[in-house]
Regions:
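Generic protein-terminus/edge-of-domain signal
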Residues: 1-67, 74, 106-107, 117, ...
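A hydrophobic/aromatic-rich effector-binding and dimerization subdomain
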Residues: 2-21, 79-142, 168-172
Length: 183
């Protein structure tokens, strides 16, 4: 049973003190989350498991490769089946970073605006799009674990590249990407 959505949730979760933070998590355990929100934007790349994610009262049954966009202050929570390994990449994004890279011909926050217009937080990717984004994320994850010359700047450049491709995908997607919504 899907829990009742509480639009008045007061549970603020997580604090971001840098431009963005990437977490690659893999676990198989009982986890229960309350409805909560963040002051930053959140991108969830679902890799494996059996998870239903509730965002602003809408539930999404996730498939490997799905991407969820959670805008700042959107109330959300995952429902996780503990019998399966849950693997995901989560990126917390500071709104100020997105604002800093806004220009007349490129607004990397557009994908977060489009989720409101399309009434769907889910991006379900085709194979070629998955491969492109996976390649960028793999390189980003590697760079973020090193202190080699230019790693901070390169990680920011890779993140911006990821956001540009994510926006291109979202701009070409038709509303059929709603097929993951179950409520």
């Amino acid at each position: 049973m899907i829990p009742i959505y509480n639009q008045y949730a007061k549970n603020k979760s997580g604090y971001l003190h840098k431009d963005f933070q990437l977490f690659h998590l893999k676990d198989k355990k009982q986890q229960e989350f309350e409805f909560h929100y963040h002051d930053f934007k959140k991108i969830i790349i679902f890799l494996s498991g059996k998870v239903t994610y509730i965002i602003e009262g809408k539930a999404y049954l996730l498939k490997p490769g799905d991407i969820l966009l959670v805008d700042n202050h959107d109330i959300h929570k995952p429902l996780i089946d503990p019998s399966e390994t849950y693997e995901r990449i989560i990126i917390w994004v500071n709104t100020s970073l997105i604002e800093a890279y806004r220009s007349n011909d490129c607004d990397i926050s557009l994908c977060f605006q489009l989720i409101k217009e399309k009434k769907s937080n889910l991006i379900r990717l085709e194979t070629n799009s998955k491969d492109k984004l996976k390649s960028i994320l793999t390189e980003l994850e590697t760079i973020m674990t090193t202190d080699a010359f230019g790693s901070t700047l390169l990680s920011k450049a890779l993140f911006i590249q990821f956001m540009i491709y994510l926006n291109r995908i979202q701009l070409t997607k038709q509303p059929h990407n709603m097929d993951g919504a179950i409520t």
